[in-house]
């Protein structure tokens, strides 16, 4: 699995071509910069069929053809530095009217490309979804949530609501994403409780940006990013580790049951 964002940096070799062909989100006012994380960027316009094909061909050449068959499609809302929805224009209309469809068409970008390659049982991890996203192999997680018991409580409602919306494959960042010191007994308690809950979620996933942060590993690209503290099951003390091992074994024993649910839940096979 590799992580892909829908943002295109001004410095990208593809930026000018995508801009000229209308493959990027437009703005009615101000500079055409919609997000400034790690550079000045604009999202590709997932509502434009030609833009979807263009992005897939780039991903196919650089990842799929080299053996990557699962994608982590982050930033799927999409996220903006300034949420001025009236200012953004998509191929099919203004963001304020059609913006919620973006994550579904982001998922469709990769689903259609992978299906055309003959792949079956397609599933990709996304940070957001919309009605119908299950048609495009969307496995949704609840985003960059805080590491707190109140946040854990919110996941119960979020997961139920996602299921009621017909999107069965859902998960959370066990322990929350933002914060949490692996050596802090209070966080260790939260992590264990969240791990127990995560065992019975459709997908079990340990992920987070732990503290204290580590120094960057390099000066360019992703290596220039600050990394979080260790976040493996053995990172939270021996007592927590023993409990986590118990629940990992339980999850492993549930694989036949989970597989059965996979083939009986709404999926691309029966929601054409």
PLM segments and residue spans:
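Aromatic- and carboxylate-enriched substrate-binding clefts and catalytic-loop regions
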Residues: 1-242
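Conserved small/polar residues in nucleotide/adenosyl-binding loops
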Residues: 263-270
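A penicillin-recognizing enzyme superfamily signal
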Residues: 113, 254, 265
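Catalytic cores of secreted or luminal carbohydrate-active enzymes
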Residues: 246-262
């Amino acid at each position: 699995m590799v992580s892909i964002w829908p943002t295109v940096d001004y410095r990208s070799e593809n930026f000018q071509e995508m801009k000229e062909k209308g493959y990027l989100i437009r703005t009615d006012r101000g500079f055409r910069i919609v997000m400034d994380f790690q550079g000045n960027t604009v999202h590709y316009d997932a509502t434009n069929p030609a833009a979807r094909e263009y992005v897939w061909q780039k991903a196919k050449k650089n990842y799929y053809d080299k053996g990557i068959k699962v994608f982590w499609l982050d930033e799927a809302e999409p996220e903006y530095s300034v949420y001025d929805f009236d200012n953004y224009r998509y191929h099919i209309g203004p963001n304020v009217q059609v913006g919620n469809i973006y994550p579904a068409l982001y998922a469709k970008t990769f689903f259609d490309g992978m299906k055309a390659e003959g792949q079956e049982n397609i599933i990709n991890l996304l940070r957001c979804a919309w009605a119908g996203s299950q048609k495009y192999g969307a496995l949704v997680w609840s985003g960059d949530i805080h590491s707190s018991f109140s946040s854990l409580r919110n996941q119960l409602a979020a997961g139920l609501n996602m299921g009621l919306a017909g999107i069965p494959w859902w998960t959370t960042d066990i322990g929350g994403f933002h914060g949490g010191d692996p050596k802090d007994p209070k966080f260790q308690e939260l992590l264990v409780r969240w791990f127990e809950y995560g065992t019975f979620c459709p997908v079990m996933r340990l992920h987070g940006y732990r503290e204290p942060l580590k120094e960057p590993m390099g000066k360019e690209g992703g290596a220039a990013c600050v990394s979080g503290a260790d976040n493996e099951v053995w990172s939270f003390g021996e007592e927590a580790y023993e409990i986590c091992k118990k629940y990992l074994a339980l999850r492993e024993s549930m694989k036949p049951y989970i597989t059965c649910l996979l083939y009986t839940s709404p999926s691309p096979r029966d929601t054409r």
